Amino acid sequence: MADICIGCHLSTSDGYAAMGRRAVEIGANTFAFFTRNPRGGNAKPLDPDDVAELRRIMGEKDFGPLVAHAPYTMNLCSSTERTVEFARTAMADDLRRMEELPGNYYNFHPGSHVKQGVDRGIELICEGLNQALFEGQHTTVLLETMAGKGTEVGRSFEELARILDGVRLDSYMGVCLDTCHVNDAGYDVAGDLDGVLDEFDRVIGLDRLKALHVNDSKNPCGSHKDRHEKIGEGTLGLDAFRAVVTNPRTRTLPMILETPNDLAGYKKEISLLRGIAASVEA
Ligand code: FE
Ligand code: FE
Ligand code: ZN
């Protein structure tokens, strides 16, 4: 059986090829990165040589798909028109730039409806996606499962399903399941991963599940908090991650660590989880 595909969030500050090299150094074969500065403004144009070098590294080291992350400040369903406008422009621009790195994922937080209500929120998110997605694109856009902090949309599988229902080019859409977020949203991912996956399948369809954010949580199930913890040191515990890296329905997906760590810490978590996955295969 193939090795798991796992990595962490990396900084773009030294360019794309540097992220690939750093990933290899810490034993990763995928990674996440922010597509632009979260403070807004224009994104740097991609340097074609830098991107080509990353693609070479990814091929040589047999990387799985990358899971790019839109900036947290991008809110397609804000109550402020300027914020919505920025989100729409940023997403469309990100998807055009992602074409330089075809075949990867672009994950984003559906948004916060800021007292407009979840129905209006979902409507705005769908409008934004329908503007940004284009026929023939080579990126799959992932909705992230959210903890349900404040007025976050995407706190339940039902809300994600309603967004997917409203997107015209939905063959370019999928879901990224964040283990900390679904726990905080009230799904017992630690106690009953199979039950949560069955529920996901019933409401959304497991064919939509494309990637995982692998995080422990500082808070109990249903707390709606969204505070990540190191693997095995939170309320989910190591057994939860043993299940994630060995379950046939999740072990083949790209897994991104967003735990509070430096690179050395990520390297340790990657080798820990690879070790567990390998021990079960044998
Ligand atoms: Fe996220
Ligand atoms: Fe996440
Ligand atoms: Zn989070």
Give short role names for the model-derived ranges.
Residues 1-70, 74, 78-96, 279-282:
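N-terminal pre-domain/capping segments
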Residues 9-13, 36-38, 70-73, 111-113, ...:
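Active-site beta-loop-alpha junctions enriched in small/polar residues
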Residues 21-27, 47-67, 92-102, 130-137, ...:
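Acidic (Asp/Glu)-rich catalytic clusters
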Residues 23, 69, 87, 98, ...:
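Conserved, mostly hydrophobic/aromatic
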Residues 31, 126-229:
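Acidic/histidine-rich catalytic cores of soluble enzymes
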Residues 32, 210-213, 252-259:
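Conserved active-site loop/cleft motifs that coordinate metal ions or position small ligands
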Residues 60, 76-174:
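Active-site acidic/histidine proton-transfer and metal-coordination neighborhood
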Residues 82-95, 118-131, 156-165, 193-198, ...:
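Short, electropositive alpha-helical surface patch
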